[in-house]
């Protein structure tokens, strides 16, 4: 048994740098060129013409508490009011994208990530989902792959019930009692 922990400072310095997180494919580091407005409009038009099913990602960058393992784009704050201007811009972006798509295109995948999307109040979560339903063809029959990231330190039973009511499937990423 070791009597003391030895920290190798050289090793720590060598590997103390950002690397890809394998939470999605392709990973973020594989995206090298910027997508122009023309490229985006062209892709949306092609999707509309083919009536392709949609996968939507909604980023909510706010967290009340930091998770030290997290490398996501986030804003740590206890000020819940900071979400309001962000949500106003999010609604505008939803409208700007939706107007280029066909209302018959089904949203087969929807993911809310962050940050911690459950940083939003119940009313704010309802508002975002209502806006998405107004502009996109979300599935109502539980056949869609709709997921949301939560902070279990802050999610209570009423929040879990709301998420289920809004169409999110409930699962867990870890069985460890303490992850962060």
Which role does the model predict for each range below?
Residues 1-54, 103:
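Flexible, acidic/Gly-rich N-terminal and inter-domain linker regions that tether
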């Amino acid at each position: 048994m070791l009597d003391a922990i030895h920290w190798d400072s050289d090793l720590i310095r060598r590997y103390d740098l950002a690397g890809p997180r394998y939470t999605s494919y392709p990973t973020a580091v594989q995206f090298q060129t910027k997508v122009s407005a023309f490229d985006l409009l062209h892709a949306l038009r092609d999707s509309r013409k083919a009536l392709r099913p949609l996968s939507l990602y909604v980023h909510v960058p706010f967290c009340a508490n930091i998770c030290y393992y997290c490398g996501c784009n986030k804003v740590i704050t206890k000020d819940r009011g900071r979400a309001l201007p962000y949500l106003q811009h999010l609604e505008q972006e939803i409208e700007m994208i939706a107007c280029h798509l066909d209302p018959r295109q089904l949203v087969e995948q929807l993911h809310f990530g962050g940050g911690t999307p459950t940083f939003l109040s119940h009313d704010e979560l309802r508002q975002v989902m209502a806006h998405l339903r107004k502009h996109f063809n979300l599935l109502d029959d539980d056949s869609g792959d709709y997921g949301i990231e939560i902070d279990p330190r802050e999610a209570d039973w009423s929040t879990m019930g709301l998420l289920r009511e809004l169409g999110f499937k409930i699962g867990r990423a870890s069985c460890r009692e303490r992850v962060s």
